[in-house]
Structures are given as structure tokens and as C-alpha cells.
Regions:
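C-terminal cap/substrate-recognition subdomain and adjoining C-terminal extension
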Residues: 1, 75-78, 82-220
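Active-site neighborhood of HAD-like aspartate-dependent phosphohydrolases
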Residues: 1-52
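Electropositive phosphate-/nucleotide-binding environments in soluble metabolic enzymes
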Residues: 15, 37, 51, 55, ...
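Active-site phosphate-binding/coordination module
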Residues: 17-23, 70, 133, 146, ...
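Acidic/polar active-site rim loop that often engages polyanionic ligands
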Residues: 18-21, 58, 138-145
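Hydrophobic alpha-helical segments typical of transmembrane helices
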Residues: 21, 60-61, 72, 117, ...
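Short, compositionally biased "basic patch" segments
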Residues: 44-70, 134
């Protein structure tokens, strides 16, 4: 059996869905541009630099989910996927995913972006499993807090282990495993699989991939 994992943002997508969701909310007038846009950009730069405090960021990013009704959120999300995400889906990424699914492999998208934003994106690719940061909800409304461990850096590895355990599986049961990612933030999970693949990597991951002899590919 083969396990194949895909990062989402800047790997299967030509951009970052979490950042774009924030920009979409700004453009829709859901959040105030003056403050939100600057914070969104600041956190995105910290992510790229590897200095992001994930809990501070999630307090910011999940706030709008708690402030609005599920009906409004779902309506905005539908427009977001149509207007912002579908143009970001890379045809070569679709082909890559389809090839692994067609081979009968166990496939999942593993992303730090929350599952409310990413669930419909993952469905666009036909991937049956999503491992993502989970926003907490109570009585049908989001609370603005995180449920469980954020799916970021070492947390990605933990969340994948938990997901596999829920299926009655473990990494050691797979004859082969691979993970496709663009980011140095994903090194803990890249180091765990048999075959790490750097996809249009950031400079830090590109250097690490060359050092370790990992393949580097482009889906752009």
C-alpha cells in the first residue's frame, strides 16, 4: 500500500488559500481593510520566513468565522472558491493528483489552512481525505478557537499520525510513502516519508532538497 500526501497552498494551488480568503473578506467588506490587510500581510511574511506564531495567527484568522452566521460564511465561501480558487488550480496539479488516485493509493491533502476554507478546495481535486487545522464549533457556530493541534510544522506530522490511527493504520504499514510540498515549514513531515518531493519550493526548502538529493518538480 502507498500513502501519498499533498500540501495545498503554493503546491497544488498557484497561491495561498488562507491569505486569499483574508483578502476576499476585505474586498467583500466583511472585515476592515485598514487593519486586517496589514495583519494578513504581516502573518504571511512571517510564515514565509519560518517565524510564524501559529496560535497568534489562528486567533486572527479564525476571528471572522466566529463573527458571522454559518449561512453567510457558506455563501461567501462558495463565491471565494469560484472567484479566487478555481483560477489558482494548476492543471498539472490536477493531473498529478489524478495519477496517484488512479493508482489506488491512499491520498490526503495536509494543510495548515483551516478545514472550513479548504474542504471545498480539496473536493475540487477529488481527494477523499483532508488533514487540516480544525476550527472549534459550539452549537453550530464557530468559536474562533482551534480544536486540537494546529496542522502546522510538527503539528502536521502529529495530525497525520492521528488521521492514520483513525483509519486503523500507521506509517510503518505502508510499503511506500511520499509528500509533495513547497515549504520549509513542512520539513518534519517531509523527513517522515520515504519520498519527499519539493514542488516549486521556497528558497529554504530548495536548498534543503538539493542537499538531501530530493527531487524538485514544478507544477506551474
Amino acid at each position: 500500500m502507498t500513502l501519498t500526501l499533498f500540501d495545498l497552498d503554493n503546491t497544488l494551488l498557484a497561491g495561498d488559500s488562507d491569505y486569499e480568503w483574508g483578502q476576499f473578506l476585505i474586498d467583500r467588506g466583511v472585515v476592515a481593510r485598514a487593519d486586517y490587510e496589514a495583519q494578513n500581510a504581516r502573518f504571511f511574511e512571517q510564515y514565509k520566513a519560518g517565524t510564524l506564531d501559529i496560535h497568534e495567527y489562528l486567533g486572527f484568522a479564525l476571528g471572522p468565522l466566529a463573527a458571522h452566521t454559518p449561512g453567510d460564511l457558506e455563501r461567501w465561501r462558495e463565491a471565494f472558491v469560484r472567484e479566487r480558487i478555481q483560477p489558482m488550480i494548476l492543471p498539472r496539479a490536477r493531473d498529478l493528483v489524478a495519477g496517484h488516485l488512479g493508482a489506488g493509493e491512499l491520498c490526503a491533502v495536509v494543510t495548515a489552512t483551516n478545514s472550513f476554507v479548504t474542504a471545498p478546495i480539496v473536493r475540487e481535486f477529488g481527494v477523499p481525505h483532508l488533514v487540516a487545522t480544525e476550527p472549534e464549533s459550539e452549537a453550530g457556530r464557530f468559536t474562533g478557537r482551534v480544536a486540537g493541534t494546529p496542522c502546522f510544522r510538527e503539528g502536521k506530522l502529529q495530525r497525520v499520525d492521528e488521521w492514520l490511527a483513525g483509519l486503523g493504520l500507521h506509517f510503518t504499514q505502508f510499503e511506500d510513502s511520499r509528500f509533495y510540498s513547497d515549504s520549509h515549514n513542512d520539513l518534519p513531515l517531509l523527513e517522515r516519508v520515504r519520498h519527499a518531493v519539493a514542488v516549486d519550493p521556497d528558497p529554504q526548502l530548495g536548498a534543503e532538497a538539493r542537499r538531501r538529493g530530493w527531487p524538485v518538480i514544478s507544477l506551474r
